[in-house]
Design a protein with these regions (language model features):
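A mature extracytoplasmic/lumenal domain signature
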Residues: 55, 66, 98, 112-113, ...
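Bacterial Sec-dependent N-terminal signal peptides
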Residues: 1-23
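Hydrophobic pocket/interface hotspot
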Residues: 38, 50-51, 59-60, 75, ...
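Short, low-complexity N-terminal intrinsically disordered segments enriched in polar/charged residues
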Residues: 16-53
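Structural motif
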Residues: 56, 102-103, 133
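Surface-exposed, charged secondary-structure patches
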Residues: 76-118
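Short beta-strand edge/turn micro-motifs at domain boundaries
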Residues: 123-148
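A short gly/proline-enriched turn/hairpin at secondary-structure junctions
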Residues: 59-70, 84-87
Length: 148
């Protein structure tokens, strides 16, 4: 009887751990939809629309090679300064590698980005922390590192 109870506890614990690391299909698709929207906005040269994927808050953090930038406005300014025209922006594609739940309304996503440009192409890796607010997912932290 003790062996059955131990097995049952291990089984319940493993289900609990599994459920804590996997998002529902609906939440995963919602996050991917935001990324798709951002990709389309970027490829249209529209940084204003691209920024809709980020939480519009001073709590937003963007970390890149220049160190952390705090706040939605400062993050937008960084994008506008770094990508002043569509030639430098290029065509963006995302490749999602992993998406996991951290808590009920928080998830992280690891992926690669690729910029196809008439100048030099660029690619790199990113880790995004997402927060679900009033049923919508927003990026609250973005750490992006360029390989080129």
């Amino acid at each position: 009887m003790a062996n059955k109870n131990i097995f049952l506890l291990i089984f319940i614990f493993s289900l609990s751990v599994y459920s804590q690391t996997n998002l529902t299909e609906k939440d995963s698709l919602s996050i991917i939809k935001v990324l798709d929207f951002q990709q389309s906005a970027w490829n249209d040269g529209n940084i204003d629309s691209f920024m809709k994927g980020y939480i519009k808050s001073n709590n937003l953090v963007f970390s890149g090679s220049g160190g952390p930038i705090y706040g939605w406005e400062n993050t937008k300014e960084r994008y506008l300064k770094s990508y002043p025209n569509v030639q430098i922006m290029g065509k963006l594609t995302f490749d999602v590698k992993r998406i996991r739940k951290v808590s009920k309304n928080v998830a992280y996503l690891i992926g690669e980005y690729h910029l196809k440009r008439s100048i030099e192409d660029s690619y790199g890796h990113f880790t995004l922390i997402w927060k679900k607010i009033k049923g919508k997912w927003y990026i609250v932290s973005d750490h992006t590192s360029s390989k080129t």
